[in-house]
Each structure stands twice: as C-alpha cells, then as structure tokens.
C-alpha cells in the first residue's frame, strides 16, 4: 500500500549529485567506431557512426584548427535541442543553475574546449516521466585534453528533472 502525506509532492524527483568522469575521442581519429559523442542524461559514450544512436547524444568532440572542440548536434546536420554554454573561470561546484537566456546556448558552431571553463549542456529532446517531451541540463568540466591523441577526459553531472535548469538537487 502506498501512503503519502498531504504535503508530499508526487512529482518531486529526489536525486543526489553524482559527478562522473568520461572519456571521448575526436571524430577525426583514424580508428572507426570510437566513442566521440556523449549522452548526458544516460551518462553514455556514443559512437555516432552507429545507426542505432539516431541522434540520441548531446555533443561530440573533434579537433579543428589546432584545438579540441565540442560539436553540438546541429553542426553535424542533426536536428536537436542539444547545446552548450561556456563559463570561463568558473568552478564545477559554483555552477548551480543553467541560464534561462536561450540565446546564450551555442547550437550551430563548434565550441572550443578549454581547461578552466565549465560548460552547461542542454540535452537533446527525449521522453521523460509521464510521457512529457523534456530537455535536461547538466554541467561538465574538461579535466585533460590530449590534442595530439585526440582524447578528452571530463567530469560531468546532469539533473534528472525534466525541463528544470537547477543543477543541484532539491533540499
């Protein structure tokens, strides 16, 4: 039997911060089928050449003009809400809320990957609880950029709350 107090919010998503590291490989590497994209909510490395991924990723990484860059899906011709906002000089723990100004989100051009910068990521649209169409917000911090090898190691965490810009769990 399920009992709830009158003050309980049945739609409240209880979650805790859980930053995790991930590694991605630049698209221009010679090896085929390397994970070069990332799904923030699922915390999955994605091989974008795999037809089963069907654009279910939020950004890819590549090397362009001597720099490592994030590629929002639209840069590669994938219709998506996936986007990034860089915040230079900010600490991972300081980033508590994704910006509400949609004009800040980069959707259509490469975003340089820089150490010492935190990136807010808006995910691709996906079906959330109760059948709603949702985007989710997360943050990431590049930890290591190996430009020669085309490898990026980063720390990320994502809120599992549909369409909610808060990057911290409810208190």
What are these model-derived regions, one by one?
Residues 6-171:
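Surface-exposed, beta-sheet-biased, low-hydrophobicity segments with strongly acidic/polar composition
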């Amino acid at each position: 039997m399920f009992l709830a107090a009158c003050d309980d919010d049945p739609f409240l998503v209880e979650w805790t911060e859980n930053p995790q590291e991930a590694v991605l490989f630049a698209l221009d590497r010679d090896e085929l089928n390397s994970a070069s994209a990332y799904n923030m909510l699922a915390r999955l490395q994605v091989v974008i050449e795999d037809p089963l991924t069907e654009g279910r990723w939020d950004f890819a990484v590549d090397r362009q003009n001597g720099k490592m860059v994030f590629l929002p899906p639209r840069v590669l011709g994938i219709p998506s809400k996936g986007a990034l906002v860089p915040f230079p000089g900010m600490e991972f723990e300081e980033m508590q809320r994704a910006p509400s100004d949609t004009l800040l989100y980069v959707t259509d051009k490469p975003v340089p990957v820089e150490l010492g910068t935190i990136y807010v990521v808006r995910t691709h649209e996906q079906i959330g609880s109760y059948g709603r169409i949702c985007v989710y917000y997360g943050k990431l911090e590049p930890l290591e950029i190996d430009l020669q090898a085309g490898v990026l190691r980063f720390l990320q965490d994502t809120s599992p709350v549909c369409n909610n810009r808060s990057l911290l769990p409810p208190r």
